[in-house]
Amino acid sequence: MKWLFKYLIRFYQKYLTILSFGSCRYYPTCSQYALWQLDNNTFFKAIYFTILRILKCNQLFDGGFDYPIIKLKKNQNINYNKIKIVYWYVPLKNGKYLVVKNREWKKNNE
Protein backbone atom coordinates (compact mmCIF):
# COMPACT_ATOMS: atom_id res chain seq x y z
CA MET A 1 0.00 0.00 0.00
CA LYS A 2 2.89 2.34 0.78
CA TRP A 3 4.37 1.91 -2.69
CA LEU A 4 1.09 3.02 -4.30
CA PHE A 5 0.95 6.22 -2.26
CA LYS A 6 4.64 6.89 -2.89
CA TYR A 7 4.07 6.48 -6.61
CA LEU A 8 1.08 8.86 -6.54
CA ILE A 9 3.05 11.46 -4.57
CA ARG A 10 6.02 11.26 -6.93
CA PHE A 11 3.64 11.61 -9.90
CA TYR A 12 2.15 14.69 -8.23
CA GLN A 13 5.62 16.15 -7.58
CA LYS A 14 6.78 15.59 -11.14
CA TYR A 15 3.70 16.54 -13.19
CA LEU A 16 1.10 18.37 -11.10
CA THR A 17 3.15 20.81 -9.02
CA ILE A 18 3.72 22.84 -12.17
CA LEU A 19 0.14 24.06 -11.71
CA SER A 20 0.57 25.11 -8.06
CA PHE A 21 3.63 27.39 -8.50
CA GLY A 22 5.36 26.25 -5.29
CA SER A 23 2.62 27.31 -2.91
CA CYS A 24 3.56 25.17 0.10
CA ARG A 25 4.09 27.24 3.26
CA TYR A 26 6.35 24.71 4.98
CA TYR A 27 9.74 23.12 4.54
CA PRO A 28 9.88 20.28 3.64
CA THR A 29 6.97 20.61 1.24
CA CYS A 30 3.79 18.72 2.05
CA SER A 31 4.46 16.08 -0.61
CA GLN A 32 8.04 15.56 0.58
CA TYR A 33 6.78 15.42 4.17
CA ALA A 34 4.38 12.65 3.12
CA LEU A 35 7.21 10.66 1.52
CA TRP A 36 9.36 11.01 4.64
CA GLN A 37 6.43 9.91 6.82
CA LEU A 38 5.81 6.88 4.61
CA ASP A 39 9.50 5.94 4.85
CA ASN A 40 9.69 6.26 8.63
CA ASN A 41 6.23 5.46 10.04
CA THR A 42 3.53 2.88 9.68
CA PHE A 43 1.12 3.42 6.80
CA PHE A 44 -1.82 4.68 8.85
CA LYS A 45 0.27 6.99 11.03
CA ALA A 46 1.91 8.43 7.92
CA ILE A 47 -1.48 9.10 6.28
CA TYR A 48 -2.84 10.64 9.49
CA PHE A 49 0.12 13.02 9.96
CA THR A 50 0.16 13.90 6.26
CA ILE A 51 -3.52 14.86 6.32
CA LEU A 52 -2.92 17.03 9.41
CA ARG A 53 -0.01 18.69 7.64
CA ILE A 54 -2.05 19.41 4.51
CA LEU A 55 -4.82 20.92 6.65
CA LYS A 56 -2.25 23.25 8.27
CA CYS A 57 -0.86 24.40 4.91
CA ASN A 58 -2.99 27.53 4.47
CA GLN A 59 -3.00 31.24 5.21
CA LEU A 60 -4.16 30.79 8.83
CA PHE A 61 -0.81 29.23 9.81
CA ASP A 62 2.58 30.89 9.60
CA GLY A 63 4.39 28.00 7.96
CA GLY A 64 8.14 27.54 8.41
CA PHE A 65 10.08 24.41 9.28
CA ASP A 66 7.98 21.37 10.15
CA TYR A 67 9.99 18.17 10.10
CA PRO A 68 8.26 14.83 10.73
CA ILE A 69 8.42 13.60 14.31
CA ILE A 70 8.52 9.84 14.75
CA LYS A 71 8.95 7.32 17.54
CA LEU A 72 11.99 5.18 16.94
CA LYS A 73 12.94 1.97 18.68
CA LYS A 74 16.68 1.60 19.01
CA ASN A 75 18.06 -1.39 17.16
CA GLN A 76 20.63 -3.30 19.19
CA ASN A 77 21.99 -5.29 16.23
CA ILE A 78 25.56 -4.53 15.25
CA ASN A 79 26.17 -4.23 11.52
CA TYR A 80 29.74 -4.08 10.23
CA ASN A 81 28.81 -3.35 6.61
CA LYS A 82 29.19 0.05 5.03
CA ILE A 83 26.20 2.18 6.00
CA LYS A 84 24.22 4.56 3.82
CA ILE A 85 22.76 7.45 5.76
CA VAL A 86 19.47 8.46 4.13
CA TYR A 87 17.86 10.20 7.12
CA TRP A 88 19.27 11.88 10.19
CA TYR A 89 17.26 11.29 13.37
CA VAL A 90 17.53 14.24 15.75
CA PRO A 91 16.48 13.22 19.28
CA LEU A 92 13.77 15.22 21.02
CA LYS A 93 12.44 13.53 24.17
CA ASN A 94 10.72 10.31 25.25
CA GLY A 95 12.00 8.33 22.27
CA LYS A 96 10.72 10.82 19.67
CA TYR A 97 12.95 12.03 16.85
CA LEU A 98 12.90 14.67 14.12
CA VAL A 99 13.51 13.24 10.65
CA VAL A 100 15.91 15.22 8.43
CA LYS A 101 16.88 14.02 4.95
CA ASN A 102 20.60 13.65 4.20
CA ARG A 103 21.08 15.78 1.09
CA GLU A 104 24.55 14.36 0.33
CA TRP A 105 23.06 10.86 -0.02
CA LYS A 106 20.89 11.96 -2.94
CA LYS A 107 23.83 13.57 -4.77
CA ASN A 108 25.94 10.42 -4.51
CA ASN A 109 23.31 7.69 -4.98
CA GLU A 110 20.60 8.90 -7.33
Curated annotation (Swiss-Prot):
Main localisation: membrane
Membrane topology: Peripheral membrane protein
Domain of life per record: Bacteria
Alphabetical UniProt keywords: Cell inner membrane, Cell membrane, Membrane
Gene Ontology CC annotation, any one: plasma membrane
Cross-referenced SMART domains: Haemolytic
Localization per Swiss-Prot or TrEMBL: Cell inner membrane
Pfam family, one: YidD
Function as written in the Swiss-Prot or TrEMBL entry: Could be involved in insertion of integral membrane proteins into the membrane.
Listed name of the protein: Putative membrane protein insertion efficiency factor
Organism: Aliarcobacter butzleri (strain RM4018) (Arcobacter butzleri)
